[in-house]
Amino acid sequence: MCAAVGEAWVGAGRGVGDVVLFAVGIHAIGGIVRGGLPITGARGRAGSVGWVSLNPVEREDYRKVGCVEAEVAAAGIVRRMIWRIKAGDRSRVQDAVNDDLSAITVDHILSAARANDGVSISVVRDTAKYLGMAAANLVALADPEMLVLGGIMASAADLLLEPIRVELGRRLPKAMIDGLAVETATLGDEAAAIGAARLAGAAVR
């Protein structure tokens, strides 16, 4: 929530009335800002995109497979790469970690994709599809003027932004896409602190 307020106040969404933030890193987070103020919901959990369903699996621990966080946060991306390697695919990621699969990070996968590693490109493509699905769900619910994409979607925009845009176009009606600005976040890790300061200042006025 605070990160969304920060981006809406002085970040990518500055001057825009209705903003939705969707960011993915270690976790998947979201936030909805309308008229400069966050929409928090009855329990302060509005915009909790990490719990949105993406995969209709039936598992005892839903947090590990099926929801946005499980599929597209860092651990989920790495898990897909490890699955591919264990299935017999060979990737330059293995060379980067000396075949220690426990050492694989998202950065290894992104770097390999930029170097035209086929397995990494496939993993990134699958990730972008899931990210686009989640983003489309947020847009459908909030109908914002701007969708701000943060975390790896900003740092790896060269790999992810266009596929996410394509997925939005596939999954949403034209009337909902027309006029929707899709931008990458600009405040990085400082967004939450900036947003918290904004809310604290508003509370004392």
Predicted regions and their residues:
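Conserved phosphate-binding catalytic cores of ATP/NTP-utilizing and phosphoryl-transfer enzymes
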Residues: M1-L21
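ATP-binding/phosphotransfer module of carbohydrate and carboxylate kinases, centering on a glycine-rich
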Residues: W9-V16, P38, P56-R205
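Well-ordered beta-strand positions enriched in small/hydrophobic/aromatic, beta-favoring residues
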Residues: V19-F22, V52, V182
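Short, small/polar residue-rich loop motifs at catalytic or cofactor-binding pockets
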Residues: V24-H27
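Short beta-strand scaffold segments in enzyme catalytic cores
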Residues: I29-V33
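A short, polar/charged loop-to-alpha-helix boundary motif
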Residues: R45-D61
